[in-house]
Amino acid sequence: NEQPGKFTTPAEVRIVRTLPGPVERVWDYLTDPEKRARWFAGGPMEPKKGGKMELFFHHKNIAPGETPPEKMKHVQDPGFKMPGTVLRWEPPHVLSYTFDEDSDVAFELTEQGKNVQLVLTHRARGKDLPFLHGYASGWHTHLAQLIAQLEGTPRPPFWPMHAKLKAEYEKLRASAPQS
């Protein structure tokens, strides 16, 4: 669960994780605003294809007492809202939605015995998304928070992990196959 994601192209990153199941529990952590806020971002989500949603990033809840980088302070507190639209709603296996103005994210869940394989794919809608490596490091860090939530273990420090991974993902993206 520590492996970095892979850039399938400079405009798409895929991260695979094995999570403790059952799949319905993992689905709840993706779709229930209160549970999602514990590891990623809260906010309402209409449970249907075409449904409206709003992610509310308020990282003081997942990184209490941590100091974020200057350009991310608004995410720590007071928080940041991102509207979106649900693209796929296939409980409890597939969730996809728009992310920011230029990209989409998809979560695919597959049962593997008592565990669940999560495949997260974040892709630019256009040809390129210059800051996709930042999104990739964010997803990697947020998924570490999700794993801790599901396992009932202490959360790793968010911002130090994010900073380290951002540099790693920038290198990985530079070596991605060209589309």
Per-segment meaning from a language model:
Residues 21, 61, 124-126:
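Beta-strand elements of well-folded, non-transmembrane domains
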Residues 23, 81-83, 106:
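Conserved beta-strand residues within beta-sheet cores
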